[in-house]
């Protein structure tokens, strides 16, 4: 009986020590911060941002970055020099469901958009369940309200994340073929 108490005390001490050293998910440097609330931004008229013969809504992000919302497929993304993107990716894109992904592609993925204009600060462009907004610093955030997932393209960092309760690890681009 005494031996069982000693074993239980030892196991409890080990578990207690492990829990005491646990770090909350929000403090983990490998966990992306949440996507900003783009829905609090003022909406713009999507017709003013129609590109690619009406197939997309497009706008300019940070210098050299083109962002689109595809009205045919429900996809959304930004292409160009993505500051701080994992693996040097030059494309981040998502679809109607699921977490957006980073990739390295040849050329400018959304070249068919042609000339695009920037969104004014603190506005958003929405198509169905996806909204993309720009803040005062020129940071682009796109959020799919259906899955609560999206991405951020900012002046120093770009990442994909989930706003659901579980933490989202930073997304690495797929390996080059």
Describe every region a protein language model picked out:
Residues 13-14, 25:
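Cleavable N-terminal signal peptides
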Residues 64-66, 84-89, 147-153:
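Short, surface-exposed beta-strand/loop "edge" segments at domain boundaries and coil↔beta transitions
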Residues 116-164:
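Extracytosolic low-complexity repeat regions of secreted or lipid-anchored proteins
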Residues 28-49, 74-120, 155-177:
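A low-complexity, Ser/Thr/Gly/Pro-enriched, surface-exposed linker/loop concept
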Residues 57-60, 76-78, 142:
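Generic recognition of long tandem-repeat/solenoid scaffolds
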Residues 46-72, 120-136:
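Short, low-complexity cationic-aromatic patches
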Residues 3-7, 19-36:
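C-terminal region of N-terminal signal peptides and the immediate post-cleavage residues
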